[in-house]
Amino acid sequence: VNDKNLEVRLRTLTPLWTGGVEAGKVDRIHETGILGSLRWWYEAIVRGLGGQACDPTTPACIYDPDKPNNGLCDVCQVFGATGWRRRFRLEVIQDEASLAWTPPPNTLNIRPPGRVGQITLRLTGDDQALALLTALLRFLERHGAIGAKPQLGYGVFRIIEIKGASQKPWVWPSLGLDQSYPALPDLRRFGFFNYRFTADWGWWSRIPALERLLGRSETARALQQLVQQGMIPVAPLLKNAWRFGHWHGPRRVELYLFGTSRDPRVRSKLNVSWAYPAKDGNSWEVRGWVWLPEQDHQGQPIAPHFLQQVWQNVRDVSIWQTALGINDGTLTCSPDVSTWQAWTTDGVRNFLKEDQ
């Protein structure tokens, strides 16, 4: 077939975690960890554009040439399903990443270390698949993350170069069915935020929680290693402020929105990066996203005023300033609304277009 190659060189802005042979250790960058996150985001985008995406935990798609679209949802057509091969290959062809810090174990409430540095991905596929993946990576560079553990602030990256980019830019289609997925990730119910501020290089050392880490030799060393790479682990500070300082609501809803590592584990719907130097080189940036679902995993509705409370707190500059010990800063939110409301499919499409 007329398969082509695309090479994407990227640099980690926060540690990248893709799992490893041994639980809790990442010995190299694993393609499967990147693929899983690309699929998760593509599912959310497809649902947000009104298309069909099966639930990956109970996949319904099996290739059947007698059915419309061969019996495959919009996502499985690209990412593969039983009897249907993925439309592209992904390989890590250069891995210059190293451990984010050298643990003694159990340091920094943000373990495990993950990897930092530059990596090059090679994507092989048809023109259309490569154009789609380029658009998806460009979107994630600005708003999302790759790999696992985004709830710890991991996986934020910057694209340095794309070689062999498709001549035809990808156009996000309106998938038009307007189906509703109240309990599955759907970009219509995502809010994105970006906080940018200027501060002297040592601003982070005055935050009490990080100051405490500096007071112990083993955590101080890990923290210094991160700082040298321009990564300040502020995610736990912000999440603690939003959850323990400003959340008022029932425990059931709190656990579902903010997550829990106890059994059964629930992944946080609110994800925020670490602080890293912005592209302009003169300021710092912290960004993230929140998914505000209509229902929890058991099909119980979540009252809109609880979702509004989370959105309002994310948009509250004073919470950011207090948590980070900063006096200035600009907070940008999408959608730019003070009262939370879901996007329309057209709104999602226009938002995606901005990144191209």
Model regions and ranges:
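Basic, Gly/Ser/Thr-rich N-terminal segments that form RNA-phosphate-binding interfaces in CRISPR RAMP
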Residues: 1-356
